[in-house]
Amino acid sequence: MNGALSGARTLLYKEVLRFWKVSFQTVAAPVLTAVLYLLIFGHVLEDHVKVYDRISYTAFLVPGLVMMSVLQNAFANSSSSIIQSKIMGSLVFVLLTPLSHWAWFVAYVGSSVVRGLVVGLGVFIVTLAFARPEFAAPLWIVVFALLGAALLATLGLIAGLWA
């Protein structure tokens, strides 16, 4: 059992390192994209859309943009990793390792969740300069971000294997 955990941890580290090496493309670009969405839609629609009395339209957009970034990047990480490995022919080396299917699954999904949460946190930190959203239940925000990222990472894994 300890060997399986070691292998899963190593594969998780490899996958996190894979997206972190090109962090400008995998982290900074999605953060910039979300900020551009916020600036464009927030600026254009701020005066025309009234959401709630106490909440500005820009503050209303921030949680949706954060969650959109988390979900998109969790899906993109797992699917692109599998597809790139298939194209380059290196997937066979991962499949030949003495890892269980669960260890393999946890490593790929875990790295995708990490990327999704890192991008989501980056979007949230950058958007604080434009709006101050209020949170009624911060614990539920974290739970939904984790579960949503895991779900989309799993769907990305399926899409990558199927493609």
Label each region the model flagged.
Residues 1-163:
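Hydrophobic transmembrane alpha-helices and immediately adjacent juxtamembrane helices
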